[in-house]
Amino acid sequence: MRVLGIETSCDETAAAIVERDDMGEGRILSNLVLSQIAEHEPYGGVVPEIAARAHVEALDRLVDRALNDAGLKLYEVDAVAATAGPGLIGGLIVGLMTAKALAMAAQKPFYAVNHLEGHALTARLTDGLPFPYLLLLVSGGHTQMVLVRGIGDYERLGTTIDDALGEAFDKTAKLLGLPYPGGPAVERMALQGDQKRFALPRPLKGEARLNFSFSGLKTAVRQTATELVPLTDQDVTDICASFQAAVADTLSDRVGRSLERFKTEFPDCATPSLVVAGGVAANKTLRAALENLCTRHGFAFIAPPLNLCTDNAAMIAWAGAERAATQAPDSLDIAPRSRWPLDEKSAPVFGTGRRGAKA
C-alpha cells in the first residue's frame, strides 16, 4: 500500500509518499519538508496567521514534488492521509482540506491522523519495532511519556503539567538574546559553558508520579540572568550549560521511573525499548543521557533519524498506512482538532492544560 501523507500542524509544510508491504515493513518513497523558520524568526516564535498563509502558498507544489520524487501519479497512490490535530487550527484546515480534495478527486480512501500517533509509530517505519514499547515525545508543544501497546492503543504515563520542554528551550534562548529556533542555539552555547556554575532546580525529581514540569526551571533561569545583568558571553554559555544539565537530570529521573513501570507491566518483553521523538530529541547531550539510562535499565534506545524526529509527512503517511491495514477509512466530514490527546479515554491532566502555538 502506498499512502500520500500531508503535515501542516505547525510551522512546517510537508508531503511524503510511504509504502507498506503485506509483512508490515515500510519504505519511504519521498519525504519533503518546507520550514517556515525565516518567516517566524523576526517574531521569536510561531505566528499562527503567518503559518497558515505559508501552508496555503506552498502545499500544492510540495505535493506535486512528492509525487514526482516517488515516480507516481495521484491515481497510483492507494490512500491519502493528513494531520487532523493537534496543532494550529489554521494550518490543520489547510492540510486537511487539501488532503480531502485529493482523496475525493482520485477516489481514494482518506485517513485523518493524530500528529502524536505519527510520532508514536515512526520507529515501526524506521526500525520495524514490535509492540509494546515506550515513547518519549519531547517537542515545542509536547512532553509526554506514552506506553504504545498497538495501533490506536496508547496510555499516557506522564505529561508536562505546565510548559513543554521545547518551549522551555525557546524561552531560555529568547531571554538570553539567542537566535530562533532556541533549542539548537542553547545547545551550541552550552558546549562552551560550565554546567556546575549555577545550581538550577530539577523539577519533580524523586517524585513517584511520572509527570514533567519545566516552568520552575524556566523561572530560575530568568532570575539567574536578571541578577547578572549585564550578561557577559561567559554568563550566557554557563547559564545554557547549567540549564541543559538540569534538563538532562530531570529527564533521566522521570524517564527512569517510566522504564521501571514498563518492566513491571511487561516482565516477559524480550526487547524492551525506549523511542525518543520530537525536535528536542536532536539534542546530543540529552540523547547521551537517555542512552546511558537505557543501558543501565536494559532497554534498547531508539531515536529515528533527525528528519523523522521533527515534524514530517512520512510519519503521517505511515500512520495512515498502519491504520489502513486494520481499520476502515475516515469520513470526509471529519473536522480538524486543535487539541487531540492520544489517550482520549484517560482522565484529563490536572490544571488548564497546555496553551500556546504548539499545544
UniProtKB/Swiss-Prot annotation:
Its EC number is 2.3.1.234. CDD domains: ASKHA_NBD_TsaD_bac. It comes from the Bacteria. One of its GO terms (molecular function) is iron ion binding. Keywords: Acyltransferase, Cytoplasm, Iron, Metal-binding, Transferase, tRNA processing. Binds 1 Fe(2+) ion per subunit. InterPro entries: ATPase_NBD, Gcp-like_dom, KAE1/TsaD, TsaD. Belongs to the KAE1 / TsaD family. HAMAP family: TsaD. This is tRNA N6-adenosine threonylcarbamoyltransferase. It comes from Brucella suis (strain ATCC 23445 / NCTC 10510).
